[in-house]
């Protein structure tokens, strides 16, 4: 904990409560340690995480996915990966997309290139443009290291100690032990907006109709009752606000048809109508 914060806390407590010098020093020290644990360490871990090699990110993501024990549909996974490959996205990451046959309405990205899509979400989709929007959004979480940064911030001091001593094996073990928590991680509004707008730009560059990006989330929100909220909606707040700025950014677009993407999507919908 920075010395100036502890000293500041010491002076504040002395003035407020008139405690003895030793008592104030102990309180200031404890307070400083708590502030450091909850604020400084998570922030530092997130910054250091930005320099983790991509090969180590892959190890991390693979370990978390293995710990989740999700069984992927090989045919569906191959089709999803072929769909993403057809977007011709240039990236240093090897993107691997797994389709899990589960009613959960969700998708999430893991460090190093792993993206997981549940069939419950695929069944809600009406067009290839919606799938393109979803995968573009999740890809940005990988490309911008949102998943890695959020994991480091969530695990705080445990991750920081591993990073400090260069113990990647320890980091992988810690992350795998928190796999279920990691699957449910929510990103900050700033990171979600970055994924929205950067993912949207991928669609615009390929002249894929981007309006369906906002429509998908709006429709999911409207279709579900208050008792059954899709996980992808509950973990992505401010859906109406996001739909509005996505539609604004996509205004004036002149999309073209993409028969290859449409064909792959049709094959997926035959598996999961």
Question: Where in the sequence are the language-model features?
Answer:
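A Zn2+-metalloprotease active-site environment signal
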Residues: 2-273
